[in-house]
């Protein structure tokens, strides 16, 4: 039982975030997917690959389409954030009694996504809602692999 105790603050925080997003930001989440079109064609993939960070945008667009049903998109986002917290704990070797520190990157990503306000309509970066989360997760995973 003691082995699963450190994950409880993470799950509690993610549940609180999910309830808040689904209660107050459902319309915003639906509009995010509306303005981020994902096509599963080779042309769309090649078009994104010529841009810097194209694979990141492609994966971000893929996950953004799940906001068509906001609960499903929030579930995907919270899943990425849970993975990020786990990787943060492993990469920085955070002790079990300090596992709350792994919430800091998630809090920063949440603020970054929610503070865009009207800029959601002007953003030219495709998949921008998931791009910082996936990029941070990839960076922390590479750091963990380097330190292992």
Task: Annotate the PLM regions.
Residues 78-95, 137-146:
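Transmembrane-helix motifs of polytopic, lipid-linked glycan transferases
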Residues 72, 76-89, 99-105, 124:
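Core alpha-helical transmembrane segments of integral membrane proteins
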Residues 1-5, 65, 69, 73, ...:
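Juxtamembrane/transmembrane-helix boundary motifs in multi-pass membrane proteins
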Residues 13-22, 104-111:
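Hydrophobic core of alpha-helical transmembrane segments in multi-pass integral membrane proteins
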Residues 19-72, 76:
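Membrane-interface coil-to-helix junctions
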Residues 1-17:
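Start-transfer (signal-anchor) and selected internal transmembrane alpha helices
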Residues 38, 49-53, 97, 101-148:
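Membrane-interface micro-motifs in multi-pass membrane enzymes
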Residues 32, 66, 91-99, 118-119:
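Membrane-interface elements of multi-pass transporters and channels
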């Amino acid at each position: 039982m003691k082995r699963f105790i450190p994950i409880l603050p993470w799950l509690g925080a993610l549940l609180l975030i999910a309830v808040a997003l689904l209660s107050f930001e459902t319309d915003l989440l639906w509009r995010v997917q509306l303005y981020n079109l994902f096509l599963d064609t080779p042309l769309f993939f090649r078009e994104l690959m010529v841009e810097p960070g194209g694979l990141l945008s492609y994966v971000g667009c893929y996950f953004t389409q799940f906001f068509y049903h906001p609960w499903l998109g929030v579930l995907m986002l919270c899943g990425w954030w849970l993975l990020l917290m786990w990787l943060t704990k492993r990469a920085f070797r955070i002790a079990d009694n300090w596992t709350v520190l792994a919430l800091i990157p998630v809090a920063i990503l949440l603020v970054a996504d929610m503070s865009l306000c009207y800029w959601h309509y002007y953003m030219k970066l495709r998949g921008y809602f998931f791009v910082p989360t996936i990029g941070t997760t990839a960076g922390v995973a590479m750091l963990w692999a380097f330190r292992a």
